[in-house]
């Protein structure tokens, strides 16, 4: 049952970005028509695929919170705290503390996930940062949550 929810989360992330790109294309046509200019199609497949990956990671993070906390309401609150409060605090810390600015890409999953909205990481260090933060903030807590769910499920 839990694996079906995981697959649905991944599929939902991919489909939602495809739908958003379609809505954006229609908006581009309408906006260009209203403004009397030619529509601009400057998003590459590389950017579109990294958008899908960023969205899927975000949904997987929400899924992980749901599995780990095992309360939908608490997981939703945790997701918003993580995305808005913690992300804001780490941004302020990075802006004001040079030591954290240098460390942020290695410890802040939201920061490294956000880089995917600009395109795929370039270079080995950027991929390593994405891997380290994904492992620490997503994979490890998800594994713990899955073990806890498996122990608590009625057979």
Please annotate each region the language model reported.
Residues 150-155:
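Short cytosolic juxtamembrane segments of multi-pass membrane proteins
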């Amino acid at each position: 049952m839990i694996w079906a929810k995981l697959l649905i989360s991944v599929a939902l992330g991919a489909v939602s970005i495809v739908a958003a790109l379609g809505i954006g294309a229609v908006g581009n046509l309408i906006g260009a028509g209203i403004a009397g200019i030619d529509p601009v199609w400057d998003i590459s497949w590389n950017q579109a695929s990294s958008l899908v990956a960023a969205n899927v990671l975000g949904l997987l993070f929400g899924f992980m919170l749901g599995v780990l906390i095992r309360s939908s309401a608490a997981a939703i609150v945790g997701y918003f705290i993580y995305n808005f409060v913690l992300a804001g605090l780490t941004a302020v810390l990075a802006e004001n503390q040079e030591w954290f600015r240098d460390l942020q890409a290695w410890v802040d999953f939201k920061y490294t996930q956000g880089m995917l909205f600009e395109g795929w990481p370039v270079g080995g260090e950027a991929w390593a940062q994405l891997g380290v933060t994904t492992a620490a903030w997503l994979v490890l807590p998800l594994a713990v949550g899955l073990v806890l769910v498996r122990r608590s499920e009625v057979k």
